[in-house]
Amino acid sequence: QFLYIEWMNEAYENYAFILYKTLIIRIAMLVAIFTFVKTADDIVPYAIVMSATTILNYLLSFLWIKREVSFVKIGLMELIKASKPLLTMLLLANANMLYTLLDRMFITKGPDENYISYYTIASSIVMLIASVLSGAINVSIPRLGYYLGKKDYESYKNLLNQGAALFYFLIIPTSIGIMVLGNYAAVIYSSEKYLEAGIVTSVFAFRTIIWAIELILGKQIIFINDHENRLTAFYFIGGGANILLNSLLYFNNIFAPEYYIATTIIAETVVVLLEIYFIKKHHLLDLKEIFTTLTRYTIVSLG
């Protein structure tokens, strides 16, 4: 992990290198798997292939960025000073454990072991698609930071609104489509044995809309404007609400996965409302255009 430096390549917008490197390594990984993994018992060869490709991926990224960035000596006091924001980032990166991962922990306590399968299938279907679509805005974060660093607020606003419009154009119709076709998606992904995961998939798809709103407000507005401390606090407030709601379901012997997704929706809605209030209070951005775009695509998709 000490070689993991992909975020630096993203910061320098080396996306062509990331694309070609990833394609080559993934192809090599597939060839190696089909060559060395012959049976279900070939666990060691599979582990070696996966470990080797991961190390190669990290090493190539490290060597590439080393051409542009040099090592610098950091004193002990500077290291201690830098540890505080790094601790905040650590908490921010792991705050998701208080949402969907927490839901799974409670669901596993239920009497029906299929419940966790339904939740996992729904999560895999929806988030697999959502994570691909979110790439449309994730690549813009370094450029947004660049504009803010230059105090070019007009360019920042234009790029943010364009990215949000593209993201919502992709994610809103997709989420509503999965909501309608949840049963079919579950069957295609996991066979008719898990047909009951269909309703869970539909509810999870609705949750993705809230997730998409939070992604823009949290990452591209609050976080990029150096308010990661407040963003972390909002995530933990929402996580606390999710713990409370999940506990309420647990003590009432309710373990159906759709109810736990509903608690996550409520918790993430709390986070979104806190973020909207914070953005308006500190005048970080006029949110009218973003929510107008969101409403427009929602109406068109429902129509």
Where are these regions (language model features)?
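Alpha-helical transmembrane segments of multi-pass membrane transport and lipid-handling proteins
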Residues: 1, 160-213, 240-252
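Membrane-interface junctions at transmembrane-helix termini in multi-pass inner-membrane proteins
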Residues: 1-20, 205-237
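Membrane-interface helix-loop junctions in multi-pass transport and translocation proteins
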Residues: 12-17, 23-58, 228-229, 238-272, ...
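Membrane-interface "helix-start" segments
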Residues: 17, 78-88, 166-167, 200, ...
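Helix-terminus/linker motif at the lipid-water interface of multi-pass membrane proteins
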Residues: 35-39, 97-128, 146-147, 183-193
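Interfacial/gating helices of multi-pass transporter permease domains
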Residues: 43, 81-89, 107-127, 154-159, ...
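Interhelical loop/hinge segments that connect adjacent transmembrane helices in multipass membrane
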Residues: 43-49, 59-100, 105, 139, ...
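Helix-loop junctions and terminal segments of transmembrane helices
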Residues: 122, 126, 130-164, 168-171, ...
